Design a protein with these regions (language model features):
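Extracytoplasmic/periplasmic solute-binding protein
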Residues: 146-163, 168, 192-252, 300
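Conserved N-terminal structural module of periplasmic/extracytoplasmic solute-binding proteins
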Residues: 4-8, 13-114, 120-136, 184, ...
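Mature extracytoplasmic/periplasmic domains
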Residues: 33, 47, 115-117, 122, ...
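Pocket-flanking alpha-helical
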Residues: 80-117, 131-159, 170-171, 192-208, ...
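Glycine-centered hinge/linker elements that transmit conformational signals in sensory
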Residues: 195, 238-284, 327-380
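A local structural motif
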Residues: 65-79, 181-182, 270-286, 323-328
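Hinge/lid segment of periplasmic solute-binding proteins
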Residues: 106-167, 342-383
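C-terminal capping/gating helix-and-loop segments adjacent to ligand/active sites or protein-protein/ligand interfaces
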Residues: 153, 428-431, 452-526, 531-533
């Protein structure tokens, strides 16, 4: 799917990057005219912004096939950061003029006549100009996350498609790491050793004793499934959400006893425990922009976040440079849960585990550390590739009442092209759409253009792009796609302590085992009453 980077597209993008907005005729109108050749688009202006929309709409309109099919093509863009705007407008039915929404999850409309069923008109159609179906070009786990299956049925359909493929993990201040002589941790034990070292440093450049910060949006939640799946393996992680226990028994409440969940809770407890001093407990009171700004002003070394940090913070970062803050932010691969050595008998300790991880990062496909078996090497290699994305809750959908359905469908198909993927990356500081496309190798000229303007400050977008090229890389499917989560109310935690904050901040003396047992009790007490109800609601009983 590699294509030459087109001069015409670059012209549009350069104009946008330079601050010039190119509008097609009629785009200045405040309200669409319900003409089937006018595409009114809504974009939720969050982490990836809205700057990618207009150049993509413009380039779409310049396609020869689009000009022939829609000779009177116009577009209009509505943009805001209101959380529920998309859902409320879709609910207006025929009174809504917006033909295409790029919003948050619209899952509540799946299976209804409110949205266009995209199964045949988008997912099973060929990507324009490319010899591949839309569904096949999409990253597998992202596609799987969009599947709609009614409770108790096996049919699959699609009512929405993702418009982002964000990768989450730890963003860290690379400049500070170097100044403090810190090494990026390969394992969770190394993470905590580093945090202990930071507590003892006497450094005027970083005058805090904690290492990790967060925001009021609990980004820490995005690390939980990664550590969990690292330990259990992706298939066992998915089996939890399917209700299949380690013995292969279906509809089994024994899934709540998965050891990987306990091991991850132990990591969380260690991070949150106040006496350890690893975590800035006040940071959870900051809104996301204020919290992320503290990374730029040297008030935290690292933060659970995502590659959207690049785009979200770029303007603020430029302003902070005038105040002397000019550090480089990077994204590290999530440290591997050290307890994985319980499942790799030839890897005897954390030092050996770290050495194996370094070999994997260097591209090795067989162990060089003495005594390590190929089987254990592959277990760690698979764990190193585990990633988590919330892209599946950034969804695009077409209201069934739209008068421009065909036009909206064609635009969604165009978004899968290499050309559209490139436009998106250049206008989101390296963000990516949910397709099998690598900017670095598929559009190297555009990649170099992006890196020349953004790499000095932000490299996490490039980091994530590189990570996804690893043949062992795997994005976990969104847990909300599983019937037990969607219909049965199943989650990562439950009961008396439904969140990490309620467990380890509000109740500072709780242990990971107590939180773990709380979830088991919630689902199994009274002879599995809640669990059986969840199974019935999910159509599994």
């Amino acid at each position: 799917m590699k294509k030459q980077w087109k001069t015409a597209t670059m012209t549009v993008l350069c104009a946008v990057i330079a601050g010039t907005t190119l509008l097609s005729a009629g785009c200045g109108k405040k309200k669409a005219d319900n003409n089937p050749q006018t595409l009114e688009v809504y974009i939720w202006n969050a982490g990836y912004g809205d700057q990618w929309v207009k150049p993509m709409l413009e380039t779409f309109g310049n396609q020869k096939w689009v000009k022939e099919k829609y000779p009177e093509y116009k577009y209009d863009v509505v943009s805001n950061d209101q959380q529920n705007f998309g859902e409320s407008r879709i609910n207006q039915g025929e009174n809504n003029t917006i033909a295409l929404f790029f919003t948050q999850s619209v899952e509540s409309f799946y299976g209804t006549d409110t949205l266009v069923d995209l199964t045949e008109c988008v997912f099973n159609q060929q990507v324009p100009g490319e010899d591949v179906l839309y569904k096949d070009k999409m990253i597998d786990s992202m596609r799987e996350s969009m599947v709609y299956t009614p409770a108790g049925e096996i049919s699959e359909s699609y009512y929405a498609t993702p418009w982002a493929c964000n990768i989450s993990g730890f963003v860290y201040n690379e400049t500070l790491f170097k100044e403090l002589n810190l090494t990026v941790p390969n394992t969770t034990d190394e993470l905590f050793s580093m945090a202990e070292k930071v507590k003892t440093l006497k450094n005027s450049e970083y005058n805090h004793t904690y290492s990790i910060a967060t925001t009021a949006i609990s980004y820490m939640n995005y690390l939980f499934p990664v550590w969990w799946a690292q330990y259990e393996g992706e298939s066992e992680y998915e089996n939890y959400w399917k209700g299949i226990d380690s013995e292969g028994v279906r509809n089994s409440s024994a899934v709540f006893s998965q050891t990987g969940r306990l091991k991850t809770l132990e990591i969380m407890q260690k991070i949150y425990t106040e006496n350890n001093g690893y975590y800035d407990r006040t940071s959870s009171t900051y809104d996301f922009m204020a919290g992320q700004t503290r990374m730029l002003t040297r008030d935290a070394l690292m933060m659970p976040c995502g590659d959207w940090f690049s785009n979200e913070m770029k303007e603020l970062a430029q302003g902070l440079k005038t105040q002397g803050y000019d550090d480089t932010m990077r994204m590290m691969k999530t440290p591997i849960v050290s307890a994985i050595i319980e499942k790799t008998p030839s890897i005897k300790n954390d030092a050996m585990l770290s050495a194996v991880i370094s070999e994997i990062d260097a591209g090795k496909t067989a162990p060089e550390t003495a005594g390590v078996t190929q089987k254990d090497f592959e277990t760690v290699r698979a764990a190193r590739g585990v990633m988590y994305s919330i892209g599946s809750v950034h969804t695009s959908a077409i209201p069934a009442a739209s008068t421009a359905k065909d036009l909206a469908v064609d635009f969604l198909r165009f978004m899968a092209t290499d050309e559209a993927n490139t436009i998106y990356a250049l206008n989101t500081s390296g963000g990516r759409l949910p397709f099998k496309f690598n900017l670095k190798t598929d559009a190297p000229e555009a990649y170099n253009e992006l890196m020349s303007t953004s790499k000095e400050t932000f490299s996490m977008a490039a980091d994530c792009s590189d990570y996804l090229t690893d043949d062992y890389a795997s994005i976990l499917p969104y847990y909300g796609k599983f019937a037990l989560a969607r219909y049965g109310g199943m989650g990562m935690l439950a009961g008396e302590y439904p969140s990490f904050e309620s467990a380890f901040i509000s109740n500072a003396n709780l242990t990971a085992k107590e939180v773990f047992d709380s979830t088991i009790k919630y689902w199994t007490e009274n002879n599995n009453a809640r669990w059986n109800r969840a199974l019935r609601n999910a159509g599994l009983l």
